[in-house]
Amino acid sequence: MMIDQIAQESARPAWQTHDHLDDPVMGELRNHFGPDAFTVQPTRTGIPVVWVKREQLLEVMTFLKKLPKPYVMLFDLHGMDERQRTHRQGLPAADFSVFYHLLSIERNRDIMLKVALSEKELNLPTATPLFPNANWYERETWEMFGVVFNGHPNLRRIMLPPTWEGHPLRKDYPARATEFDPFELTRQKEDLEMEALTFKPEEWGMKRGTENEDFMFLNLGPNHPSSHGAFRIILQLDGEEIVDCVPDIGYHHRGAEKMGERQSWHSYIPYTDRIEYLGGCVNEMPYVLAVEKLAGIEVPDRVKTIRVMLSELFRINSHLLYISTFIQDVGGMTPVFFAFTDRQKVYDLVEAITGFRMHPAWFRIGGVAHDLPRGWDRLLRDFLNWMPKRLDSYVKAALKNSILKGRAIGVAAYNSKQALEWGTTGAGLRATGIAFDVRKWRPYSGYENFDFDVPIGNNGDCYDRVMLKVEEVRQSLRILKQCLDNMPEGPFKADHPLTTPPPKERTLQHIETMINHFLQVSWGPVMPANESFQMIEATKGINSYYLTSDGSTVSYRTRVRTPSYPHLQQIPSVIRGSLVSDLIVYLGSIDFVMSDVDR
């Protein structure tokens, strides 16, 4: 029977993923802290997951950061409400947990540290002295779960208004607006909200002036053409010079992670498109790969190549908008209109294949929505013949312009050490000389079968970042040409019980297959209780999904790590001492959208 088959498949280990319990770092940890110091959790994340005691946390992280091949980046930090989780066999008792995901460039390996917390002692020491980018992550973890980080420089709300009450990612917090009392905005409440947004320099350790003169405090945004979305930066100015600044985010926050707890594994796919709304199918990739790890699904080669093709089309589309708007921020208007002509050709191709343009929601658990249509190859070939010359025109007409180069070269530069400290990935990291591209270093969806280069820079400035994007478009065109020439034959879905939706023809076999199809489409597939993780090279850096299944049709915890979030946190450290005009160029060079930051 189909139900028995699902049970058998669920018992198998996930494909192409290992717990890495034999990772050399485990031996190093045991040798230093003792064989019984930790609880090791088997997962389908593909990385060691180690539970450490609260009092050992900073010592363990310091040890990992000082190893001969160190774990130099705090890739992610967040929490989980463990109180309603039923499948916790072998794990330390916990009401809540906080995880620290560390990354080593030299090892090309990760490790995840977890700390169990009781509701009565919901506190941890801050990790900001070790990893400065822990600042925002700890603020968000306190905001969403109520975990207090002792010693944090400014533990306050980050995604939600200052007046918000409660911790939304707790399991006892309502997930729908209809579960709250009707919202009413009185004049008194409106005044209170506006007062709460008033910037008070003293709360951020800023002085209002010197003995001789006052500083100016200026709001850039949240509605400003150069802030690239609903994003506010409070500038502390001495004339035109930026003494300090405070990025203020959250205006675009939609509760994407909370939504993951009430959507089925299948019905959450459209939400992934909207995390970074320019990325389209790129955003779907880490989510469906993480779910497929939970399910133990290996997709056909044709599916892998189709996914790569759609991802690279969206990468080009996003990069073209970035390149043209960067030029616009510096003062050149014409390339924006050129770019929209070129992007229209990409959208026409995407629409012909998927039926939609910006948000196709086209990848599926175990495959894609449908096979490639007749004529897709002709459309792709026409685009590949068109784009290279157009790309050259951007470089010749604008990016080699002496005025643009004068505004961008040497501006907002940082080195590789600083990039790693702040969790910078993507072109922002590669511009400092580190060729870390997940498609090359940790291939997924068959990227190991494609021939392409990873461009790098040397100066880590605005000009390096934009020129890297130009070269990345060229490399994406190379990948697309290989997709065109070497598209495998075969099915567009995996033959697996948890492929969703299941192949329609199965419903015609007997009543069990019809029941299974009905349940998977209406309620969603039941994923084995476990944890999985997948990172990918998205358009703006590394995007990842960390999924926790409790053996049901919905995710127990969906953690979305986006690249733009740490990139904006880095702004003050880079731009202090520069001019306001340099900040505009720097913002244009980061490549971010606020949906990616705020989720």
From Swiss-Prot:
Region (NADH dehydrogenase I subunit D) residue spans: 214-599
EC number(s) given by UniProt: 7.1.1.-
Record-annotated disulphide pairs: none
Subcellular location: Cell inner membrane
Keyword terms, alphabetized: Cell inner membrane, Cell membrane, Membrane, Multifunctional enzyme, NAD, Quinone, Translocase, Transport, Ubiquinone
Pfam families, alphabetized: Complex1_30kDa, Complex1_49kDa
GO CC term, one of those recorded: NADH dehydrogenase complex
Catalytic activity: a quinone + NADH + 5 H(+)(in) = a quinol + NAD(+) + 4 H(+)(out)
Region (NADH dehydrogenase I subunit C): 1-190
Membrane topology: Peripheral membrane protein
InterPro entries: NADH_DH_suC, NADH_DH_suCD, NADH_Q_OxRdtase_suD, NADH_quin_OxRdtase_su_C/D-like, NADH_UbQ_OxRdtase_30kDa_su, NADH_UbQ_OxRdtase_49kDa_CS, NADH_UbQ_OxRdtase_CS, NDH1_su_D/H
Protein origin, superkingdom: Bacteria
Any GO MF annotation of the entry: NADH dehydrogenase (ubiquinone) activity
HAMAP family: NDH1_NuoC, NDH1_NuoCD_1, NDH1_NuoD
Subunit-level organization: NDH-1 is composed of 13 different subunits. Subunits NuoB, CD, E, F, and G constitute the peripheral sector of the complex.
Described purpose of this protein according to its UniProt entry: NDH-1 shuttles electrons from NADH, via FMN and iron-sulfur (Fe-S) centers, to quinones in the respiratory chain. The immediate electron acceptor for the enzyme in this species is believed to be ubiquinone. Couples the redox reaction to proton translocation (for every two electrons transferred, four hydrogen ions are translocated across the cytoplasmic membrane), and thus conserves the redox energy in a proton gradient.
Family statement drawn from the similarity comment of this UniProt entry: In the N-terminal section; belongs to the complex I 30 kDa subunit family. In the C-terminal section; belongs to the complex I 49 kDa subunit family.
UniProt-recorded name of the protein: NADH-quinone oxidoreductase subunit C/D
Gene source species: Photorhabdus laumondii subsp. laumondii (strain DSM 15139 / CIP 105565 / TT01) (Photorhabdus luminescens subsp. laumondii)
Highest classification ranks of the organism: Bacteria, Pseudomonadati, Pseudomonadota, Gammaproteobacteria, Enterobacterales
Gene: nuoC
